[in-house]
Amino acid sequence: MKVSLALLTRGAAVAAAVSAVSVQAYAQAPEEFYSGKTVQFMVGYPPSGGFDAYTRVAARFIGKHIPGNSTVIVNNMPGASSLQFVRYLQSVAPKDGTQFGMFNRGLMPKSVLEPKEVGADFTKFTWIGSMNSEHSFCFTWGAKGINIIKDLGTKPITLGETSKNSGGYIYTSIFRSLNPENIKPVLGYSTTGHIWLAIERGELDGNCTLLSSIESQKPDWLPQNKIDVLVQFSETKHPSLPNVPTIFEILTSENEKKAINFLIASEQIGRPIIGPPSMQADRTATLRKAFLDMMKDPEFDEFAKKLKMDMDPLSGEKAAEIASSIQSTPPEAVELARKFME
């Protein structure tokens, strides 16, 4: 097969031009690079629900802290409880700092439990930060009158969830392990908002969810005793739930407690923001700083408080450490955790 010298020369010229553009992009200062750019703050859920709400608040303010005054828009990429978005970041998204976003932290332990199904190693992603730590619990609608100690073995409970990939499903599964016969997950809802509507209509008994989501989106539920909180998933009780038992008070086995710790460790990274693997180092530093500066912004703080959103920021470096600790959980704890999820 003969290849002309002209064709080879032309190919070399194109390659050199592409290389020059790439080098130029890498060499640009952050302010120069982001100037006039449109940045996509993505979220692995449809509009509605807690993740979307936190994403929109962050997207509203983070742009002023990114050098160059770029335009920040929200891009919803729902699917498989944000797994579709994670896979997009992993394989498709540019690594230049123009696309990053929020995903379901429950995928982190799931990636260890079911590595083939998830297909993502969260230690490889670029960690920008987390907007808060979370506190999860399971509840039933107040009219049901269910008491975890007295009624768990006698009354059937239906708990709504979006899918087995959702963060809430982890807590539903742990709760279900207390009485597999009576606690029934009902999957297939598109958003948490749809689950809560079904609960209000009497189609479901309850849900396992985040305290912050309830406080921001259903602020009357707890103060007006519209829901009964059955169990909270943490080692210590939340100040607003002093009379609700923790899962660690109900379980007695130390091995079970270690497995639960693995499953709920991602609570510390409540609203995680990540970029694609191998993001350029200077863009990583720029976005991490922009995130922390946003979290300290008085205007941001005032706006979040109006929406009753809890904020407890975690740096990208610290979030990456927690992701690494989840990934390196001892096999025996992972195996026991897997049984909880069956």
Where are these predicted regions, by residue range?
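A short beta-strand structural signal in non-transmembrane regions
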Residues: 270-276
